[in-house]
UniProtKB/Swiss-Prot annotation:
UniProt-recorded name of the protein: Spiderine-2a
Entry keyword set: Antibiotic, Antimicrobial, Cytolysis, Disulfide bond, Knottin, Secreted, Signal, Toxin
Gene Ontology terms: biological process: defense response to bacterium; killing of cells of another organism
Family: Belongs to the spiderine family. Cationic/spiderine subfamily.
Domain of life: Eukaryota
Amino acid sequence: MKFALVLLGVCAFYLVNATGDLETELEASELQELQEALDLIAETPLESLEAEELEEARKFKLPKINWGKLASKAKDVYKKGQKLAKNKNVKKALKYGKQLAENLAAGEVHEPGTPVGNNKCWAIGTRCTDDCDCCPEHHCHCPAKSWTFGLIPCSCQVTESDKVNKCPPAE
């Protein structure tokens, strides 16, 4: 607040001094208003401004925190997390995530989205529509139903014992 008033005073003082040559163009009332603003700033004691700021600070109070309620919410979230960890679908998703992380950390030769070989197949993690989009040693895995294709897309994955690439071999 003090800074703003000082800045306003400096600007007004500059304008009053800079308008010396332009007095003929400016109306006398405008110059009078600027001089009154400068006088008002000079008359305002800084102590009253500090008192106003202190009063505003006293009025502001931080919201009270109910620590008991917060602790019970944290406990509920922890219990839900434990329940989710036991869910078989979550375990599958975790296994999938770990597999993907291992493949990425292992320094796969091909980044997702880059063609492999002679542009005949796509790397692990790349979106696919069927097994023919993926390499022969991979398969196209769709984790969700077809109506959620846009939300959870199919991707090329490492072929496991129960999954096989059903694309006919290239000639």
